[in-house]
From Swiss-Prot:
The keyword Signal applies. Residues 1-17 form the signal peptide. GO terms for molecular function: growth factor activity. The keyword Transferase does not apply. InterPro entries: Fibroblast_GF_fam, IL1/FGF. Pfam families: FGF. Keywords: Growth factor, Signal. CDD domains: beta-trefoil_FGF_Bnl-like. It comes from Orgyia pseudotsugata multicapsid polyhedrosis virus. PROSITE patterns: HBGF_FGF. It comes from the Viruses. This is Fibroblast growth factor homolog. Belongs to the heparin-binding growth factors family.
Amino acid sequence: MHRLALVVATVAYLCAGHAPLQHITGTQRLVQVLIHNRYLAVRSDGTVGGTTYASSLDTVLQRIAIAHGRILLRNAVSCMYVCLDRCGAMYASAALSSDCILNEVMLENNYDVMFKIYNGKKTYVALDNTGNPRRVQLPRQRPLRMMNVYTFIMRIPLNYISVSQCAKPNKVIRHRKLPLVVQTTLNTISIYIITHVTMLFDHVD
């Protein structure tokens, strides 16, 4: 824990002492998020997972309240947001999209859950037994029951103030776009289908 304190203090110093004033968006309380006995790690490569390494900078997060019951969860160093897409995949993004605006419900015994609602289903921030993201999607009114082990969150406050150097987003994009390779593949398939259907009709004529 002393090592983490040193790391967090260093982060706060670097952000406060060496960031241009126009990039400072305000102070945020630092937290760690514990799910299924692992710390939620938000990585700069766009992945989110769990780790037992409590001193990792990937686990130093900012919980930013934007409205009642709605939050942003952001890594304090990389400025990457925790996001959930419509398929239930959890990922990290430097661009703030609607996928990253999370609902938060506080439960008993100091636990809470974070989720998105898509098409009448709740998609939860969740980790499996090995610390990988677990897709948990349930109808809106269905209780978690046995799924609570993967979704219950305990927030651990860190007794430091971080001066954020993350740029304030100018807009919120709608959702995560498909990777370029997927878009290219879909376009190729569409062109192939259209071409062969056209040839078929020409042959019939």
